[in-house]
Amino acid sequence: MSLDLALDIQHATTCDWLPTDEQFALWATTAIGNSMDEAELTIRIVDSRESQMLNSTYRGKDKPTNVLSFPFEAPPEIELPLLGDLVICAAVVENEAREQQKTLEAHWAHMVVHGCLHLLGYDHIEDEEAEEMESLETQLIEGLGFTDPYKEQ
């Protein structure tokens, strides 16, 4: 079974380097895996200002963040392949990659995988949940050819 992914990528940033649409599709498809037969996903790449506004509005944190996940929640009687939206702040991803001594590509891949797992219901609030999510993220990221995103540099 392979995933039929309808991916909408929105560029709302002036960042110098962004992954290709093909990279975004590969990373999202890898994260979603066999969880769904088909999925519709929007990835919106934003600047710090938009990220800060959304983070403040939806999480009560008045600062930009790397990735926000907005799962689509349909009524139980309606079956739609809408997975949800990811909003990724290019400037935060770039800064974190530099601080963590990772390549931009590796950190972008991690943010897409991380965000997609949130859309699938994974979380990292409780220690046990965090352990499960981080383990799956590491497995997926390493499967894409990158190093463990949680390994100390």
From Swiss-Prot:
Binds 1 zinc ion. GO terms for molecular function: metalloendopeptidase activity; RNA endonuclease activity; zinc ion binding. Zn(2+) binds at H114, H118, H124. One of its GO terms (cellular component) is cytoplasm. It comes from the Bacteria. Its EC number is 3.1.-.-. Keywords: Cytoplasm, Endonuclease, Hydrolase, Metal-binding, Nuclease, Ribosome biogenesis, rRNA processing, Zinc. SUPFAM superfamilies: Metalloproteases ('zincins'), catalytic domain (SSF55486). Its cofactor is Zn(2+). Coiled coil: none annotated. It holds the Pfam family YbeY. Its main location: cytoplasm. It is found in: Cytoplasm. GO terms for biological process: rRNA processing. Belongs to the endoribonuclease YbeY family. Single strand-specific metallo-endoribonuclease involved in late-stage 70S ribosome quality control and in maturation of the 3' terminus of the 16S rRNA. This is Endoribonuclease YbeY. It comes from Shewanella baltica (strain OS223).
